[in-house]
Amino acid sequence: EGEEIILSAAEILQDGCFYRENYRSAVAEYHFISDGKKRHVRPHFTFYGFRYMKVEYVDKSGKPTEKPEGSVDNFTAHHLRSDFDQTGCIETGVKKVNQLFQNALWGQKDNFLDVPTDCPQRDERLGWTGDAQIFSETACYNMYVPAFYRKYLWDMRAEQSIIGGSVPHVVPRLKREFIEGHGSCAWADVAVVLPWNVYVHYGDKTLLEECYPGM
């Protein structure tokens, strides 16, 4: 009771060191103080993008302690994403090409959690419209995503209704410096490019009809 477990997320080990500067202001830590009872614990209202997870144990006085034997077995990582089926696959005789495709596929899985985000780990994790439209064609090849994109574009039109039809940089929009901006070329192209790419891949004009007034 009173002992603390600290989980810290990171993507890389730089020269053998636990490196998190690329996370910028994202703390990416989970602290749990035990009440002395055996519990199954998980984070709420957040998620982490990581390759490595550091586990630290702190006693009641705040001093680091040795980890219990076999403690790694007490942790399980769960992958979170929106539910869609994979429809595309590339396999060649070149391992590096195959790995490149897998990296792109997992990049999509990691960033498709309710909205198409720019990254799953640092202090953004936002639905940038520029990122969404430029990756949309690849996304349609990889996964069956018409419903996913329809929901995102519904959110976009809701934001447009608030800012006079302009397309925001980020959907859903946040009131933060630069992020709350709207009406820029490339980012605003999402209103045309994304519904068009969905139509080309799936042949359904419904999304075009829904989005046309906001184009």
What are these regions (language model features)?
Residues 43, 125, 139-142, 181:
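Short, charged/polar micro-motifs that form catalytic or ligand-binding hotspots
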